[in-house]
Amino acid sequence: MQLFNLPLKVSFFLVLSYFSLLVSAASIPSSASVQLDSYNYDGSTFSGKIYVKNIAYSKKVTVIYADGSDNWNNNGNTIAASYSAPISGSNYEYWTFSASINGIKEFYIKYEVSGKTYYDNNNSANYQVSTSKPTTTTATATTTTAPSTSTTTPPSRSEPATFPTGNSTISSWIKKQEGISRFAMLRNINPPGSATGFIAASLSTAGPDYYYAWTRDAALTSNVIVYEYNTTLSGNKTILNVLKDYVTFSVKTQSTSTVCNCLGEPKFNPDASGYTGAWGRPQNDGPAERATTFILFADSYLTQTKDASYVTGTLKPAIFKDLDYVVNVWSNGCFDLWEEVNGVHFYTLMVMRKGLLLGADFAKRNGDSTRASTYSSTASTIANKISSFWVSSNNWIQVSQSVTGGVSKKGLDVSTLLAANLGSVDDGFFTPGSEKILATAVAVEDSFASLYPINKNLPSYLGNSIGRYPEDTYNGNGNSQGNSWFLAVTGYAELYYRAIKEWIGNGGVTVSSISLPFFKKFDSSATSGKKYTVGTSDFNNLAQNIALAADRFLSTVQLHAHNNGSLAEEFDRTTGLSTGARDLTWSHASLITASYAKAGAPAA
């Protein structure tokens, strides 16, 4: 067996090195996105140093202060911080500030990046300034997040120092499983005899044959690797080479002759040639997901290596090629992510919108104002279409519209929830913690709770097993009856963790008539209009109950995974035994992103 096209002994060493770097990365300054290190005010000069998490290349850090009369001047008293130096062995940078001011009483820090705003306001107390020697903060300083259109006053509350603890047993298990899943995921990349950068959906070649590179699966898998390259594995050359290999394979397939003669070709052979058999094509979510992954990689790569030539010469043309395609085809029918229904799909539109929004920012940074404008306006038009998928009479999101062929189904589908995890951009638009996603989560879960025998008489520590959609007949290697999918169950756990993170960033959450069925599951006293404010016992209890529910989904994954941590595509709806493709790459990638979300640090 080979890994990274190297003999087993060498590749095993590389994977072990990968794991050891993850352990050592725990010594980075803080999990906060922005945190004060130290400051000094001598009566005339105010200066300091700030830890800034390197989320993207383009960022802005500002110190906002009240003057000697404790007047904020409508938050007009500002000092711009500037980049100073990277912090070795971490994904943090030092930023510094210095200004001559006549007087200062208190201050806080604002960090703007990728459409989000983070704050360090010293747990809502702000930093109180005295004329003294330099003062250093402790690692307990925390960060709050806010929508990109932030207010002119500091946030009223700070994010708690700890994410809800959930189930400690599951916390221990998932860290172990995360390592197993990472190894399995990497094992499916560059298998022997394949073209450089080939990411197999599974190494299974019969019963079923999944030994192909699906554009979607490869992009979502690489997105996980990019996130780690940008955070816990910053600077890791092995992982960088894996990502560059993925780019090489992907760029080649962009120009490969295919049956659909378009970028929406779903899958490719191990030698990077197009699959020519009958299939549901095109699948237009793939180019959008690939562009998103390429953009995240471009930002991280440029920050870490300062090598602009690779970004402008290789990544930029590929990104623009994919997104130009999305602009031209987004309103056309195509096959869904399950490859079974031809129509217009909620999931596909969500990942398209995300790719275009990131692409607009990327184009602007790269001097292409025309594309930036086109991508932005198209994303806005797509958002209007996405909103039409909400069916108020059902209180859930319809999965598809304008269906012209394929499987007939009522419209409930777990992909609408995966779209929130994978296709939202932290702007409140169908995000995991938004009311319509929460309502749909209740409806989808309820549909499987009564359908699958495995969900009958569940012990209290388990969550419901979740499939793709209730009418599913694909059994993993043919047609009879659908089963639970590991990535659907971990997707539910991730959705819950992301929702909690979102509410913390927003200072709380208010129940609406739409989301009430969700909140009733975790607080019997919930009513429409009730607000759970961060820092209150009501919010803490709610967050902990939802985290425990997420952990019950992970307990279900733990129960049905193989003893060695292997995760197939599915597990049987009656017996609970694994079925379908062995060690599905997407199953393992989904487990890893759920683990990050459980730790309060969801992937981009």
Swiss-Prot record:
Region (Starch degradation): 116-604
Keywords: Carbohydrate metabolism, Glycoprotein, Glycosidase, Hydrolase, Polysaccharide degradation, Signal
GO biological process: polysaccharide catabolic process
Reaction it catalyzes: Hydrolysis of terminal (1->4)-linked alpha-D-glucose residues successively from non-reducing ends of the chains with release of beta-D-glucose
Glycosylation sites: 122, 167, 230, 236, 564
CC annotations in GO: fungal-type vacuole
Entry EC no(s): 3.2.1.3
Entry GO MF terms: glucan 1,4-alpha-glucosidase activity
Binding residues annotated for substrate, in chain numbering: 279
Domain CBM21 residue range list: 26-130
Record field: compositional bias (Low complexity): 130-162
Signal peptide (UniProt feature, chain positions): 1-25
Active site (catalytic residues): 336, 339
Region (Adsorption to raw starch): 26-115
Region (Disordered): 127-164
Presence of the UniProt keyword Cell inner membrane in the record: no
Taxonomic superkingdom: Eukaryota
Miscellaneous note of the record: Rhizopus glucoamylase exists in multiple forms, Gluc 1, Gluc 2, and Gluc 3, all of which hydrolyze gelatinized starch at similar rates, but only the largest one (Gluc 1) is able to adsorb raw starch.
PANTHER family xref list: GLUCOAMYLASE, TREHALASE
Family: Belongs to the glycosyl hydrolase 15 family.
Protein's UniProt name: Glucoamylase 1
Native source species: Rhizopus oryzae (Mucormycosis agent)
Lineage: Eukaryota, Fungi, Fungi incertae sedis, Mucoromycota, Mucoromycotina
